Amino acid sequence: MLREGQILFTYLHLAPDFPQTDELIKSKAVCIAYETVTDNMGRLPLLAPMSEVAGRMSIQAGAQTLEKSHGGRGLLLGGVPGVEPAKVVIVGGGVVGANAARMAVGLRADVTILDRNVDTLRKLDEEFQGQAKVIYSTEDAIEKHVLEADLVIGAVLIPGAAAPKLVTKEHIAKMKPGAAIVDVAIDQGGCFETSHATTHAEPTYVVDDVVHYCVANMPGAVARTSTFALNNATLPYIVKLANKGYQQALLEDKGFLEGLNVIHGKVTCKEVAESFDLEYVDPEQAIAMFN
C-alpha cells in the first residue's frame, strides 16, 4: 500500500521484525519511527507517553494475573494486615519501570527495581525513599530476585534495537508455581526468553507454571487515555512535517532525524541494520541522495 515518497510516521519497532522491515525497504517510503526520535536531552519524547501508560498498566495486568482464576498464585498485590504483600520485581528502571514502581508502591507491594544505570538508581532511590529497593542489575541479581518474585515486570529498552533476553527459560523454570510475568518489552521482541506476543483478547499463556502476560501494544486497552497522551506529544512534529516537508524538518532537528529508520529503500537506523545484517546509510546522506 505504501509507495515511494509517502511519509509513514508512527511506531515501527523494526529491530525484531524483519518482514516489516523488508516491506518498508521495498516500498521506498520515508519511514520515521516514534520510538527513536530524541529530544535535546537524549530522551524519547514520543515513546514516553506510551511507556508511562504501559508501565502503569503492567501492574494492573500483573495484579489481575496473580488471581487464582487467571492461573496465578492467588495473591493480593498489597496484602492485608497480618499477611505479607506480593513481591514485585521490575527489570529496568526507565520510564516504564519507574511508572510500574509508582503503581506497585501505591498498592503497597514489596517492590524491587533492577537497573544498570547508577544515576537512574540514585534518582529512583531518592524518589521512593526506601519504599522500593533499588539494585544494580547483574546476572546473579536478576536470578536471585526473579526466583523470589511473585510478579516480574520486564521493562528493558535499548532504543531502536531488539530487547535483550535478560530472564532465561532456566530462570522461568525455577520460579514459584503461579508466579506471573508481564513483558512490556514485547513490542521490541521481549526480555524474557519464554515470551511471545499475545493479544488483548487472549492475553496470557503458561510456561512451567508461570503465567505470561505479553500483550503487544498494551496501551491499546485504554485507547482514550493513550490517544490524548500521544496526540499531545506528536502534534508538534506533525506540524513541522506539514509546514516544512520531511527533508527540512528532519535536517533542522537532529533529534527528529534520529527517528528516520528507512528512506527510499535505505536503512538509516544502525540498530535495525545490525539486527538483520543490512547496509546502514547515514540519515543525512540518505536524504541528500534523493534531494
Stretches found by the model and what they are:
Residues 21, 59, 100-101, 121, ...:
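Generic hydrophobic/aromatic pocket-lining and core-packing "Φ" positions
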Residues 1-23:
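An N-terminal-biased, well-structured beta-alpha scaffold segment characteristic
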Residues 69-157, 204:
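Glycine-rich phosphate/diphosphate-binding loop of Rossmann-like nucleotide-binding domains
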Residues 3-7, 27-29, 176-179, 210:
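A short helix->loop->beta-strand "cap" motif at the edges of active sites that frequently abuts
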Residues 126-209:
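Rossmann-like adenosine-cofactor binding region
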Residues 13-14, 29, 36-39, 116-118, ...:
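Short, ordered loop/turn segments at secondary-structure junctions
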Residues 35-76, 186, 191-291:
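Adenosine-phosphate binding glycine-rich loop
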